[in-house]
Amino acid sequence: MNPFASLTLTTLIILTIPIMMSNSNIYKTNLYPNYVKTTVSYAFTLSLVPLLMFMHTGQEMIISNWHWMTLQTVELSLSFKMDYFSVMFIPVALFVTWSIMEFSMWYMHSDPFINRFFKYLVLFLITMMILVTANNLFQLFIGWEGVGIMSFLLIGWWHGRTDANTAALQAILYNRIGDIGFVLSMAWFLTHSNAWDLQQIFMLNNECPNMPLIGLLLAAAGKSAQFGLHPWLPSAMEGPTPVSALLHSSTMVVAGVFLLIRFYPLMETNKLVQTMTLCLGAITTLFTALCAITQNDIKKIVAFSTSSQLGLMMVTIGINQPHLAFLHICMHAFFKAMLFMCSGSIIHSLNDEQDIRKMGGLYKAMPFTTTALIIGSLALTGMPYLTGFYSKDLIIEAVNMSYTNAWALLMTLIATSLTAAYSTRIIFFAFLGKPRFPPLVLINENNPLLINSIKRLLIGSIFAGFIISNNIPPMTVPNTTMPLYMKMTALIVTIMGFMLALELNNTTYYLKFKYPSQTYKFSNMLGYYPSIMHRLPTYHNLSMSQKSASSLLDLIWLETILPKTTSFIQMKMSIMVSNQKGLIKLYFLSFLITIMISMTLFNYHE
């Protein structure tokens, strides 16, 4: 086995050491979180070597060394696919997770079960690594289900809270809907291709029909929270902030997009599925950006921004640019994790206050967090020469040059503008103006665990885009020719969003309270989607069940059919066989009339 394969496998095996140490004495002490964090940092350092080797040689590799089982004619083996996507993604995921774990040591320091929390985080990372490196559908499905169950455990970490339990159940149920599509696609490929290895599937299905690809699209929509299966993502904010940062930056939510990127050789020849992906992504990115504008929970605003960026990635796949979508996944991980960690820093300092209306004036008390959040927001909006610019600007250019669907283009541009608007809103409400929180709150951001973790991602949010985009294939990008206004589209719509948000904030700062309009309610209530989908079907099902139980069983069978029907039949039968009606007065009168008539007749003959 060459060094490339050996070092890659070593990186993956190192991550399992903290899990295996669960039975040791280290797990029972306070040193375990630090041990896990150090292990992940070593794994990251080691993963850079295969990345550099891949960048130098450009050779992909499949490691297949352990036979699992044989199902009739399908042979399943433990195989790892070390290609452009997996070799690039592993260091990014490890770097971000390393920072999040250091942040967790500060954020979760008072939790009595912090060791178990770190074990869950490592398991979450391992399952994501399995998903990314899998070379067959069965192994990919193990990683897919692994991130699902670990997200359930981590979102519901504070299981004493009803909202946390509800959010965890909601996440797992929406993902179950997506899993139906995944299992359907697996069954189709097994039936028609007799293979689950990715190379065999791509060779045997040059022109893939719609059914398996639509199944994969459904799976991606569930995992990446696309429109229709999106409500679980903002609800997942009930979990601890490190979970939100890990879930929404480099792991679970990008798994759906990553699945479609893996299957791009089949999708690029299927125009119907590409169009569906494009439209779904455009609707998601616009709808979630609209919802983010009126939210007041700082974590939910960042969560909706994640959903909006996932929609943008789906749009990119829809215009047949999977490598560009993957580049955006890598860039997005840095600043999105940092935005969540800055939110966590604010929430922790303000005694778990998440409402941006109860913040304000924090730029003096928390200068480092303010700087990091502003740079993260600028990177999110695609400000030139920050990390987000190197992928987002290319995506907008590619969408502009595409002639596929003008409506999808327009929706994407509006969502890009709204990204700047809600980012400005967070900055304006949380950091500027006068303080709107109690004066006795102790604010301290000088913990080295917090500072170092955010600082690392801050450097990544500034320089990672330049470093990655200049060192990955293709090394030489051909010069594109396009009009200046088209090249500047992304920047223009972003600046328009900033100006609109500043104008709105300045205008509304001194206004009196006005009753919310229907448009505001539509955005604030997330388009009424959760209310309708979570309440109406369940209410109607329960009421129908109740009515069928009470009306069908109790009212009809136990009351109408047996007692009432029996008594009614008996009454009818008694009426039929009886001559007497119980009319006493009429009976006496008939007797009297009969006597009078008979006496009259007898007297007449005399």
Swiss-Prot record:
One of its GO terms (cellular component) is respiratory chain complex I. Pfam families: NADH5_C, Proton_antipo_M, Proton_antipo_N. The chain crosses the membrane at residues 1-21, 43-63, 87-107, 112-132, 137-157, 171-191, 213-233, 241-261, 273-293, 301-321, 324-344, 366-386, 407-429, 457-477, 482-502, 582-602. Keywords: Electron transport, Membrane, Mitochondrion, Mitochondrion inner membrane, NAD, Respiratory chain, Translocase, Transmembrane, Transmembrane helix, Transport, Ubiquinone. GO terms for molecular function: NADH dehydrogenase (ubiquinone) activity. It catalyses: a ubiquinone + NADH + 5 H(+)(in) = a ubiquinol + NAD(+) + 4 H(+)(out). One of its GO terms (biological process) is mitochondrial electron transport, NADH to ubiquinone. It is a multi-pass membrane protein. It is found in: Mitochondrion inner membrane. Its main location: mitochondrion. Coiled coil: none annotated. Its EC number is 7.1.1.2. Belongs to the complex I subunit 5 family. Core subunit of the mitochondrial membrane respiratory chain NADH dehydrogenase (Complex I) which catalyzes electron transfer from NADH through the respiratory chain, using ubiquinone as an electron acceptor. Essential for the catalytic activity and assembly of complex I. Core subunit of respiratory chain NADH dehydrogenase (Complex I) which is composed of 45 different subunits. This is NADH-ubiquinone oxidoreductase chain 5.
